[in-house]
A protein has these predicted regions:
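Catalytic activation segment of kinase domains across protein kinase-like and atypical kinase folds
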Residues: 109-187
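Structural motif at the C-terminus of the N-lobe alphaC helix and the adjacent alphaC-beta4 loop
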Residues: 1-17
């Protein structure tokens, strides 16, 4: 999947996808030894626990990818939300929606299926020119996006699929079907899952009550995920939408929602 999607970066359609560098197959033993030298890391602890329970194969496939120096989106927000202005929120949300819109234009049935905040990486750079704006063309529409020194990149496509092009056995299991992780077109699914998990317990659950989060940001998120789709019969326990009605699409939000009005050229 990552190799296929990298075409959008290489052709200049979006910079917001992690690029693969290479992959190889090897025995898992060297990684177990490496993990044991980082005993204070929770991620490595979890890795070792699963290894001890024989949850991994002896031979594994290793992917080397582009590095993102800002960690994942969830950690970035938790560390920076107190100083983030409306502009920063708008640009970051634009980047997330724009890359989905670009992918869905060519592959309408594409689903990431696990677009939670910690599956989005962040690249941070110094802002040398505060007046600089980047020109995006998304499905024939122009947008001018301020340079905030932050660039997001989609990552972790383990559950992603494009029916008929890239199949994924993980989305054909009974347990995934029950929570609507399936190879069925729904251009709202990834949008919903990102915003709904972002504001839930275990992620950034104080989002709705924090004074530091601008009200325009909260209002936008509520328009994307209204209450009826944030919990209840339409949503799984962990926040996944349980139907495949396309309530709204990324491109529609960019083209028509007032939140992105400043990025659209004046007519």
């Amino acid at each position: 999947m990552l190799k296929l999607l990298s075409e959008f970066v290489l052709t200049g359609q979006t910079p917001h996808i992690v690029l693969p560098i290479g992959s190889f197959n090897t025995n898992i033993s060297p990684f177990v030894k490496l993990a044991r030298t980082f005993s204070e890391s929770k991620k490595f602890e979890n890795f070792l626990e699963k290894y001890e329970k024989n949850e991994y194969y002896d031979d594994v496939s290793v992917l080397i990818s582009e590095w993102a120096n800002g960690g994942d989106f969830l950690d970035y927000i938790k560390e920076n939300y107190k100083t983030m202005k409306l502009k920063e929120w708008r640009v970051i949300f634009f980047q997330i929606l724009s890359v989905l819109a670009v992918i869905q234009k060519k592959y309408p049935a594409f689903r990431h299926n696990d677009l939670k905040p910690n599956n989005i990486l962040v690249q941070v750079s110094e802002v040398n020119n505060k007046t600089l704006k980047f020109r995006y063309v998304i499905n024939g529409h122009e947008y001018y996006v301020p340079n905030i020194g932050v660039q997001i990149k989609l990552w972790d496509f383990d559950f992603a699929c494009i029916p008929g092009i890239i199949e994924n056995s993980k989305v054909d299991a009974d347990w995934t079907d029950k929570i609507n992780i399936k190879p069925e077109q729904n251009r709202y699914y990834d949008v919903h899952y990102f915003f709904n998990t972002f504001t839930r317990k275990g992620f950034f659950n104080n989002f709705w009550i924090l004074d530091e989060v601008p009200k325009e940001v909260k209002e936008f998120v509520r328009r994307v995920v209204p209450l009826k789709y944030s919990e209840g019969k339409n949503v799984s326990e962990r926040g996944r939408i349980l139907h495949n009605k396309e309530f709204v699409r990324p491109d529609i939000l960019l083209e028509h929602d007032v939140f992105f009005e400043k990025m659209r050229p004046k007519k």
